[in-house]
Amino acid sequence: MFPRGAEAQDWHLDMQLTGKVVLSAAALLLVTVAYRLYKSRPAPAQRWGGNGQAEAKEEAEGSGQPAVQEASPGVLLRGPRRRRSSKRAEAPQGCSCENPRGPYVLVTGATSTDRKPQRKGSGEERGGQGSDSEQVPPCCPSQETRTAVGSNPDPPHFPRLGSEPKSSPAGLIAAADGSCAGGEPSPWQDSKPREHPGLGQLEPPHCHYVAPLQGSSDMNQSWVFTRVIGVSREEAGALEAASDVDLTLHQQEGAPNSSYTFSSIARVRMEEHFIQKAEGVEPRLKGKVYDYYVESTSQAIFQGRLAPRTAALTEVPSPRPPPGSLGTGAASGGQAGDTKGAAERAASPQTGPWPSTRGFSRKESLLQIAENPELQLQPDGFRLPAPPCPDPGALPGLGRSSREPHVQPVAGTNFFHIPLTPASAPQVRLDLGNCYEVLTLAKRQNLEALKEAAYKVMSENYLQVLRSPDIYGCLSGAERELILQRRLRGRQYLVVADVCPKEDSGGLCCYDDEQDVWRPLARMPPEAVSRGCAICSLFNYLFVVSGCQGPGHQPSSRVFCYNPLTGIWSEVCPLNQARPHCRLVALDGHLYAIGGECLNSVERYDPRLDRWDFAPPLPSDTFALAHTATVRAKEIFVTGGSLRFLLFRFSAQEQRWWAGPTGGSKDRTAEMVAVNGFLYRFDLNRSLGIAVYRCSASTRLWYECATYRTPYPDAFQCAVVDNLIYCVGRRSTLCFLADSVSPRFVPKELRSFPAPQGTLLPTVLTLPTPDLPQTRV
């Protein structure tokens, strides 16, 4: 039932009021939605010209708020979208310069600013928001006039990023850090000082530089240029950007080889804030933070004479964040309370693995030598693994410094800085770690002085070279014989070891027959002093086999070695069993330890393997005690002691023992030696003195050849120098001339050993002459 009269009129009035309210609300909602859709639409790519600037100007005037225009560098094209900006902010302009006739190629970015802030409508007037100064990055001379301040350079070579709604302003923090080594001084080095760019300006965080490969005019040049970008703050957010690039040049004068390295860090931090319209005490800003990080490393390596524009940089991204944080560098004048922070350079990034160029990286090899003396020939005593057959073409001559502290061979090759003149050869110090590489290089370069120095090191350390397959295995047969003969150069001397077990002391003395004087040679280590020890020389080394050591006279199997060319004592492989009072002889490059107390076994030492092995023992029905042994014609002869009437002969080729011609008498045999194919046996008689018997290899018969009349002769031991047999005792030293026709004792009595403390053990060593300097390794 419809209302009538006054009720109907009131009802119609109420319906009209309700409809108006509903229609007004719907219209307001539609307008709001349309406005939001209009404001949130993606901005089209803006052209670089007057149209784009006019559009930005109109939008800025309509909103009443200044905007910041940003252009991202090429490496950040995939990052977040940037805010639309007003005419106040500018984008970096591209600059490309390639001069075919010039010494360099430069590709970088340039910027210019045209800041004229305007505000209309409800926007609040603010002034003094930063400086209108700008920065003109380095450019080539052909485009220097086009990139001047206030000009409009050519369009850039990278697209502009999109924009976002003005209702959600953002703050952006971007930084880049890079370093580039190599090249020549740029034409802008002496230009006018750089100025700070305007607010909101952002430049590419990295530029590509291609430096010349052949630089001989300057040495060790370096420069650094930095670009710092300002900051523009708004009421609800901030846009902050910073960009810097470091360029350092290290170029050696006249160097045909160059290495270029470029590393950069780009970090983008974007803060998106939303404004709360409601009044109250709750926070007015809420937003999101986007953090992006990009690190790239590049390297270009060139060898020889190449064209100036053939460099190729390889980027290696790294997922690790930079070690330091980057902040803002400048603040807006009108909003000083909203801006804070300081510009801070990030630390140098950790670069990825370097690419290999032409087989191996020259950066990891040539640039390590100056700061790593292990790769040079100057230090003493270092050990460096030597490849058996190094690459002949991989040994350069010179090197530059580097920042890498690690030392490692590159492509299996070690590099050395060596003198190329004979006058500088005496200053070189080699060791066993580099002698073969230096020898190979010296033979290739025909450097006789350096080759002789390498042979000298090998000969003075022959035992170590013999045990090293990387050195001895690569030498030819002639070179092996050469280093051995070089070790035996010099003059043979009678060397006597005075061993005193009671005082645990001992020493070596050599006898100078020209001046009839004894000279001290070296001290024996306490470990090598023992009772009943034996000595022998092999390859001009003195070997000492221990006897009984300590107060309890415990048998010892230790063996020691002395190098007279370097003056160094060392310990070698011990015996398989202790042998006090054994006889030690050298035959065919091996040592033989024969018998000992209550022993008839024999051991053989191989110096190349540093190992003792058992050899065929003496015949089972013999008992070797206080015997003597010598070597003749690659055979070992043993007699004396309990073998008074027997003579045993050992053949190293057949590895067996034979019984020789029966000899000897009731007198005690003191010593037996071999000279010029004859065996000489010295027997002691208390009443008659010393009787000398000789046996030839052809007749194999013993006969008396000489006597020395003296009552109660002292015991002695013999050593042979040329054709002289020295009989060394505690109280006297006799000399016997082993002449093939008329063997005899020398009438002149020699000077006795000075103040003997213990047992005297003679041997023969070849000592260098005083005018030959020795190398201690």
UniProtKB/Swiss-Prot annotation:
Biased amino acid composition, Gly residues: 326-336
Membrane-protein topology: Single-pass membrane protein
Chief location bin: membrane
InterPro entries, per database record: Kelch-typ_b-propeller, Kelch/BTB_domain_protein, Kelch_1
Compositional bias (Basic and acidic residues): 113-127
Sites carrying sugar chains: N257
Any one Pfam family match given in the protein's UniProt record, by short name: Kelch_1
Modification Phosphoserine occurs at: S86, S365
Region feature (Disordered): 43-207, 313-359
CC per GO annotation: membrane
Keywords: Glycoprotein, Kelch repeat, Membrane, Phosphoprotein, Repeat, Transmembrane, Transmembrane helix
Residue ranges of the TM segments: 21-38
Chain positions of Kelch repeats: 328-374, 492-538, 541-589, 590-632, 635-677
Location relative to the cell: Membrane
The name this protein goes by in its record: Kelch domain-containing protein 7A
Native source species: Homo sapiens
Upper classification of the organism: Eukaryota, Metazoa, Chordata, Craniata, Vertebrata
